[in-house]
Amino acid sequence: MHKKKYTFSMWMKYLEKFDKKDRKNLFELKLIAKKLGLLNLKSFFFTVGGTNGKGTTCAMLEKLLLDSGYQVGLYTSPHLINYSERIKVNGLYLSEKDHIFSFLIIDAEKGNVSLTYFEFITLSALFLFSQYSLDIIILEVGLGGRLDATNIIDSDLSVITNIGIDHTSCLGTDRISIGREKSGIFRKGKIAVIGEKNIPISVDEIAKEKKTILKKIDVDWFWTRTKIDSWNFIHSNIELYNLPVSRIPLSNTAIALASLFYSGLEVNLKKLKSSISKVQLSGRFQTVFNSPRIILDVAHNVHAALYLSEKIDEIDTEGQIYAVFGILKDKDVAGVVQVLQKKINYWYVVNLKTNRSASINYLKKKLSLNNALFFNNINESWQAIKKVITKKDIILVFGSFFTVSEFMSIKDRRLTLY
């Protein structure tokens, strides 16, 4: 069948078959983007990289900019349920028809060039943005930075939220190596906002080499939690007090604020507090049901698990905590579990619907948990939990975007059984 007749779901299946090869440079990708006129868009670009917190930082940045009256495009990854989640224009998702049109354009222009899934959809996102008069475009880095598809764009301001150990097979096994890869998004003479206090030396080295201006937390800008329900943000040009506590990590809200103020863009300070309090991102310590409380979190590495552990400590519960846990085989499985082992009473370990999943046999060998049950899929674990759960208990679904996504696909029709 000719691709002009492809439905949206057919395009999804087609794209999922694309190569996953490692790229040595971005030359071919830039060539396609140049032909499409995507390298000279007049928008102000933010490129947001880092190990964790990219999505929430982007979501907060988008909200702050929209409420300041800007026309904003947002590109994030991965999606939880539907591909359309990845691309928003002025806070709204685009139609399947829009995406299909863009896919046809990119597919025709790439010719015989072999692209990865992420490279193809990044070009598609940029093409869609080019169809609008956008003041600002926010790009979330997919993986690393230096060789990431988003790095074909020379951003006006780059962000590194933090640097942890993840994706070691392609980024390196230590923070210095990973920091070097993530700093690949830096640009000469441009500002890069750094959201972590103890960054590896490689970040400073790349910044010096590229003549990038670093704006570091606790050096150039600051934030402090003052009360349980308020915090302060201090920047060289502005001081904000008694800000509301956001529903995303405060550290990422602060990074978004720093990025916005260092961009030089005008900010609507009157709407700032309202903007901060409204942002919520699916799968980020998201409560989807109460009594019993069900929390979804995409935490999948040690750095994210540490934050999740802190959030669990804030919960006042008389019941037990059950974990529905599925994780990919290339992650630090033992490290993630070790962080949360003492916080969780019962582990319901699952196999995920992806060939990247850590198998049940692998997890049984890797984990020394006396309080764990193992299941072939999320649905089986869910049926088992429902037989023992009480209204005072907590169910924590975490370990991967896949884990949360698979749970979200069954939760709506199952919650009524409580």
UniProtKB/Swiss-Prot annotation:
It comes from the Bacteria. Keywords: ATP-binding, Folate biosynthesis, Ligase, Magnesium, Metal-binding, Nucleotide-binding, One-carbon metabolism. It is an enzyme of class 6 (ligase). GO terms for biological process: folic acid biosynthetic process; one-carbon metabolic process; tetrahydrofolate biosynthetic process. ATP binds at G53, K54, G55, T56, N252, R284, D297. Binds 2 Mg(2+) ions per subunit. 7,8-dihydropteroate binds at T116, Y117, F118, E119, L147, D148, A149. It catalyses: 7,8-dihydropteroate + L-glutamate + ATP = 7,8-dihydrofolate + ADP + phosphate + H(+); (6S)-5,6,7,8-tetrahydrofolyl-(gamma-L-Glu)(n) + L-glutamate + ATP = (6S)-5,6,7,8-tetrahydrofolyl-(gamma-L-Glu)(n+1) + ADP + phosphate + H(+); 10-formyltetrahydrofolyl-(gamma-L-Glu)(n) + L-glutamate + ATP = 10-formyltetrahydrofolyl-(gamma-L-Glu)(n+1) + ADP + phosphate + H(+); (6R)-5,10-methylenetetrahydrofolyl-(gamma-L-Glu)(n) + L-glutamate + ATP = (6R)-5,10-methylenetetrahydrofolyl-(gamma-L-Glu)(n+1) + ADP + phosphate + H(+). Its EC number is 6.3.2.12, 6.3.2.17. Pathway: Cofactor biosynthesis; tetrahydrofolate biosynthesis; 7,8-dihydrofolate from 2-amino-4-hydroxy-6-hydroxymethyl-7,8-dihydropteridine diphosphate and 4-aminobenzoate: step 2/2; Cofactor biosynthesis; tetrahydrofolylpolyglutamate biosynthesis. Mg(2+) 2 binds at H167. Mg(2+) 1 binds at S77, E140. SUPFAM superfamilies: MurD-like peptide ligases, catalytic domain (SSF53623), MurD-like peptide ligases, peptide-binding domain (SSF53244). One of its GO terms (cellular component) is cytoplasm. Its cofactor is Mg(2+). PANTHER family: DIHYDROFOLATE SYNTHETASE-RELATED, FOLYLPOLYGLUTAMATE SYNTHASE-RELATED. Belongs to the folylpolyglutamate synthase family. Monomer. Functions in two distinct reactions of the de novo folate biosynthetic pathway. Catalyzes the addition of a glutamate residue to dihydropteroate (7,8-dihydropteroate or H2Pte) to form dihydrofolate (7,8-dihydrofolate monoglutamate or H2Pte-Glu). Also catalyzes successive additions of L-glutamate to tetrahydrofolate or 10-formyltetrahydrofolate or 5,10-methylenetetrahydrofolate, leading to folylpolyglutamate derivatives. This is Dihydrofolate synthase/folylpolyglutamate synthase. It comes from Buchnera aphidicola subsp. Schizaphis graminum (strain Sg). The gene is folC.
